[in-house]
Design a protein with these regions (language model features):
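Gly/Ser/Thr-rich helix-start
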Residues: 8, 12, 147-148, 161
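C-terminal edge-of-domain segments
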Residues: 149-172
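Intrinsically disordered, low-complexity acidic/polar segments
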Residues: 160, 177-178
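Ribosome large-subunit tunnel/peptidyl-transferase-proximal elements
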Residues: 1-138, 170-172, 178-191
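Conserved short secondary-structure elements within globular domains
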Residues: 131-153
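Short connector loops at helix/strand junctions that flank enzyme active sites
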Residues: 115, 144-146, 163
Length: 191
């Protein structure tokens, strides 16, 4: 019986599984980065990866957790902007700001945002993916409470082992747009 056994083994030991999940989470974040046309491994569709259904179901909570941490961290970083300075680093004005009480308030207001970045980095171990998450993905989801991703099962199984494939993608970018039918216009007879 499988009572209280959470998660799928996926034919791997725990360290291999943890590395697999971290790599897949960073892969979906990195599909959103700026790419050039000459880059050999540019994603076909940003914000989407194709994997097996079981792997997609396992990494989805991890992706959602990272985005939630990033959204909360962005809110804290925005609160620190009122205490920041525009002076150039190393200048006399900057040194005065650095020694003042305002700097302490800025550092205290900014620290939860930095902690959020460190927590996400501890989960996925990819600095570039963390930057993409905080700079381009999390700002899109600031008004959304959760459910940042969707899993769509693909009809064709994987060649070789007949594994069920699925798409894991971010919600809101490739949504279907339903067109409303236009109401017919009737001419009103003048009497």
């Amino acid at each position: 019986m499988r009572h209280r056994r959470k998660g799928r083994v996926l034919g791997r030991n725990s360290s291999h599984r943890k590395a697999l999940f971290a790599n897949m989470v960073s892969a979906i974040f990195l599909t959103e980065r700026e790419t050039t046309e000459l880059e050999p491994n540019a994603p076909k569709v940003p914000g989407r990866i194709i994997t097996t259904l079981e792997k997609a179901k396992e990494i989805r909570p991890m992706v959602e957790k990272c985005i939630t941490i990033a959204v909360k961290g962005l809110a804290k970083e925005a609160g620190a902007a009122e205490f920041a300075t525009t002076a150039e680093r190393g200048s006399k004005e900057w040194k005065e700001w650095r020694k003042s009480d305002i700097w302490r308030k800025w550092a205290d207001a900014r620290s939860p945002g930095i902690t959020a970045r460190r927590r996400v980095y501890a989960m996925i171990r990819d600095k570039q993916a963390v930057e993409v998450l905080f700079n381009s993905i999390a700002p899109r989801f600031t008004t959304r409470e959760g459910g940042y991703t969707r899993i769509m099962r693909l009809a064709k199984p994987r060649l070789g082992d007949n594994g069920t494939r699925a798409i894991l993608e971010f919600v809101g970018k490739n949504d279907r747009v339903t067109k409303k039918a236009t109401k017919p216009a009737f001419e009103v007879a003048a009497t």
